[in-house]
């Protein structure tokens, strides 16, 4: 069904975006720990070359920073990996695995990749897959809701609080840059899947429309 939907949409949207996703079997056979570790290594490299001055960059330029590119890619990759599966049962397995990865990322204090995955799981193309979500265990759905609530920003309209938090970010940056990940082993085959690939065929809005159309074809 997923392939049929893809070919149907290929006739509707030309050119169609390239999709580099693993099969459900390969994706879930690789432990969630491995994905969490590789994402952490990629994030460490991206943030290691960033500068505090980038926090004041205007939105269009900020979107091109290494950490933003990685965030957007991971979120899109999560959506595409789920939608590439042919039946609700397989999609549920993949969704469950992503929740496990997000849980481990939270434990590793890698909020960047954690937020990217959670935003993908709560995006319109994925959230609407009722049949898929009904096959995800209650414990995992509860874990997802808990993680998502932890990332909410209840004080985002409080200027004083926001300023205080920003100052803490500035002061803590040297400490985080000094953290070593030498104990983590790079796995090229996994990083190849996770590294950003630039889409020139469709803009982000077009890609979002594309994935939503795939979602509605899979589960009307």
Feature annotation, model-predicted:
Residues 1-220:
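Eukaryotic small-GTPase/lipid signaling interfaces
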């Amino acid at each position: 069904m997923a392939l049929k939907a893809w070919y149907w949409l290929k006739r509707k949207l030309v050119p169609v975006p390239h999709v580099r996703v693993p099969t459900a079997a390969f994706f879930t056979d690789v432990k969630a720990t491995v994905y969490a570790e590789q994402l952490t290594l990629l994030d460490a490299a991206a943030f290691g070359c960033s500068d505090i001055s980038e926090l004041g960059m205007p939105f269009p330029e900020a979107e091109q920073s290494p950490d933003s590119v990685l965030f957007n890619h991971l979120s899109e990759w999560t959506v595409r990996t789920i939608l590439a599966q042919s039946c609700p049962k397989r999609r549920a397995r993949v969704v469950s695995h992503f929740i496990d990865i997000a849980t481990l990322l939270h434990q590793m204090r890698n909020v960047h990749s954690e937020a990217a995955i959670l935003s993908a799981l709560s995006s319109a193309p994925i959230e609407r897959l009722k049949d898929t979500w009904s096959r995800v265990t209650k414990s995992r759905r509860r874990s997802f809701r808990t993680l998502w609530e932890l990332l909410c920003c209840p004080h985002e309209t409080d200027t004083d609080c926001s300023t205080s938090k920003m100052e803490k970010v500035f002061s803590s940056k040297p400490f985080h840059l000094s953290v070593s990940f030498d104990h983590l082993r790079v796995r090229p085959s996994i990083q190849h899947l996770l590294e950003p690939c630039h889409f020139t065929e469709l803009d982000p809005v077009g890609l979002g429309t594309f994935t939503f159309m795939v979602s509605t074809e899979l589960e009307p």
